[in-house]
């Protein structure tokens, strides 16, 4: 069946309205992924070093994390979110610049929590690197 003339194929975007969100920052040495969720954990928007235009080793830089955080913060403010909790995971260099950018963009940060997984004597670690 052919599509009628004058109709669009784009979906209608739902008008989302929240006042509170959770920002998850996963910072590795290769990339930083920033996800904005509602309080139930449903993803609203996300950005990473790759989605803001960096490739390869530059995705892991603090500047890439800063731009990704700015993109998420602008989207959050557009949705009406003003207050956020920040959950940080991982040891990468993008942790602090991302938090500073979220705060500088106008989001009110309630709490910052480090949720980096630490094993309680779990799996045997990889052998030590010899250079």
Swiss-Prot record:
Organism ancestry: Bacteria, Thermotogati, Thermotogota, Thermotogae, Thermotogales
Record organism: Thermotoga neapolitana (strain ATCC 49049 / DSM 4359 / NBRC 107923 / NS-E)
Descriptive protein name: Small ribosomal subunit protein uS11
Keyword Signal listed: no
Keyword set, alphabetical order: Ribonucleoprotein, Ribosomal protein, RNA-binding, rRNA-binding
Record's GO cellular component terms: ribonucleoprotein complex; ribosome
Listed GO MF terms: rRNA binding; structural constituent of ribosome
Disulfide bonds: none
Entry annotated with the keyword tRNA processing: no
GO annotation, biological process: translation
Family: Belongs to the universal ribosomal protein uS11 family.
Role according to the record: Located on the platform of the 30S subunit, it bridges several disparate RNA helices of the 16S rRNA. Forms part of the Shine-Dalgarno cleft in the 70S ribosome.
Quaternary structure and interacting proteins, as annotated: Part of the 30S ribosomal subunit. Interacts with proteins S7 and S18. Binds to IF-3.
């Amino acid at each position: 069946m052919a599509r009628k003339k004058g109709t669009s194929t784009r979906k209608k975007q739902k008008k989302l309205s929240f006042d509170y969100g959770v920002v998850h920052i996963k910072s590795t040495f290769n990339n930083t992924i920033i996800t904005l969720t509602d309080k139930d954990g449903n993803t609203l928007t996300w950005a990473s070093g790759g989605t803001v235009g960096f490739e390869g080793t530059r995705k892991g830089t603090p500047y890439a994390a800063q731009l990704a955080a700015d993109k998420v913060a602008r989207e959050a403010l557009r949705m009406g979110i003003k207050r956020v909790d920040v959950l940080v995971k991982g040891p990468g260099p993008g942790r602090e610049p991302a938090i500073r950018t979220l705060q500088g963009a106008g989001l009110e940060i309630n709490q910052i929590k480090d949720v980096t997984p630490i094993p309680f004597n779990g799996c045997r670690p990889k052998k030590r690197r010899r250079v």
